[in-house]
Swiss-Prot record:
InterPro entries: Anion-transp_ATPase-like_dom, ATPase_ArsA/GET3, ATPase_ArsA/GET3_euk, P-loop_NTPase
UniProt binding sites for ATP: K45, G46, G49, K50, T51, T52, E251, N278, P319, L321
Protein name per Swiss-Prot or TrEMBL: ATPase GET3
Keyword annotations: Acetylation, ATP-binding, Cardiomyopathy, Cytoplasm, Disease variant, Endoplasmic reticulum, Hydrolase, Metal-binding, Nucleotide-binding, Nucleus, Transport, Zinc
Tissue: Expressed in the epithelial cells of the liver, kidney, and stomach wall, in the adrenal medulla, in the islet cells of the pancreas, in the red pulp of the spleen, and in cardiac and skeletal muscle.
Taxonomic lineage from the root: Eukaryota, Metazoa, Chordata, Craniata, Vertebrata
UniProt organism field: Homo sapiens (Human)
A molecular-function term among this protein's GO annotations: ATP binding
Length: 348
């Protein structure tokens, strides 16, 4: 695990007594080959290329898995741009693939914004989505968490071989990983005050023409979701089933965010042992460029620090390209770099 942000300023001589450690393979082959994985999260600071990396990973996984789903939980919903295809809140097949599906959700909108396909007739839909939103608004964070819970229930029911999450920036990502705890805490609070809010719930049900329903019945309905939540929570903390891939660029602020994310993942007991360093500049000796050389020098400094701090991680180095990675064909081409280290012009 990382030594901590403070270690970035340590002079090189302080590492002289440390034994040499053989660097781990600089690819995501370990992820592709670990067939027990069911949940793969890709995240990091905004603007570092998370979506391109997560879509590329999903493409590579689709070549060896029966069915793959990539979910965007980022309100920006860039996977539609990456594949040049419009996706919705329901899993849709990616053009050109028989076993790769994509969907985009915005958990911050809450349960009431999810489509009817997410709700079983005898469960949340029968209570009315608007009432659910009103009831949940009393518990900070639980509406978003319940939205995650319903998505997980849907996804688990479809039995995808593996699910890749293209996550929002760090704060949203940590809420996603903590949603089981938030839901359980919210339900506990609901049980404490159920007698006080029972008239409100009954009134809402009558207004919606749903008949009488008291707080006990609402709590019972919500508790039906708990087995799924607890199952997912256990899987998230199992390194055989879940891992997190950090994406960053070789700059101080991005590395700082990556270190903070890794520390938070450790607190959540979420496995992480892969870092993608994106947008690296590799000067071409045949086409001198002072700015490129200066940029390369700065990036090399942070790369050296990363290799000292994260010696137990697979560090994948990806180049800054002169074009956008947009469309299924370009994503497929770029995805090869996840399995084969990039060779800059000077090394060819």
């Amino acid at each position: 695990m990382a030594a901590g942000v403070a270690g970035w300023g340590v002079e090189a001589e302080e590492f002289e007594d440390a034994p040499d450690v053989e660097p781990l393979e600089p690819t995501l082959s370990n992820i592709i080959e670990q067939r027990s994985l069911k949940w793969i999260f890709v995240g990091g600071k905004g603007g570092v290329g998370k979506t391109t990396c997560s879509c590329s990973l999903a493409v590579q996984l689709s070549k060896g898995r029966e069915s793959v789903l990539i979910i965007s939980t980022d309100p920006a919903h860039n996977i539609s741009d990456a594949f040049d295809q419009k996706f919705s809140k329901v899993p849709t097949k990616v053009k050109g693939y028989d076993n790769l599906f994509a969907m985009e959700i915005d958990p911050s909108l809450g349960v009431a914004e999810l489509p009817d396909e997410f709700f079983e007739e005898d469960n949340m839909l029968s209570m009315g989505k608007k009432m659910m939103q009103e009831a949940m608004s009393a518990f900070p964070g639980i509406d978003e968490a319940m939205s995650y819970a319903e998505v997980m229930r849907l996804v688990k029911g479809m039995n995808f071989s593996v699910v890749v999450f293209d996550t929002a920036p760090t704060g949203h990502t940590l809420r996603l990983l903590n949603f089981p705890t938030i839901v359980e805490r919210g339900l506990g609070r609901l049980m404490q005050i159920k007698n006080q809010i029972s008239p409100f719930i009954s009134q809402m049900c009558n207004m919606l023409g749903l008949g009488d329903m008291n707080a006990d019945q609402l709590a019972s309905k919500l508790e039906e979701t708990l087995p799924v939540i607890r199952s997912v929570s256990e899987q998230f903390k199992d390194p055989e089933q879940t891992t997190f891939i950090c994406v960053c660029i070789a700059e101080f602020l991005s590395l700082y965010e990556t270190e903070r994310l890794i520390q938070e993942l450790a607190k959540c007991k979420i496995d992480t042992h892969n870092i993608i360093v994106n947008q690296l500049v590799f000067p071409d000796p045949e086409k001198p460029c002072k700015m490129c050389e200066a940029r390369h020098k700065i990036q090399a400094k942070y790369l050296d620090q990363m290799e000292d701090l994260y010696e137990d991680f697979h560090i994948v180095k990806l180049p800054l390209l002169p074009h956008e990675v947009r469309g299924a064909d370009k994503v497929n081409t770029f995805s090869a770099l996840l399995l084969e280290p990039y060779k800059p012009p000077s090394a060819q």
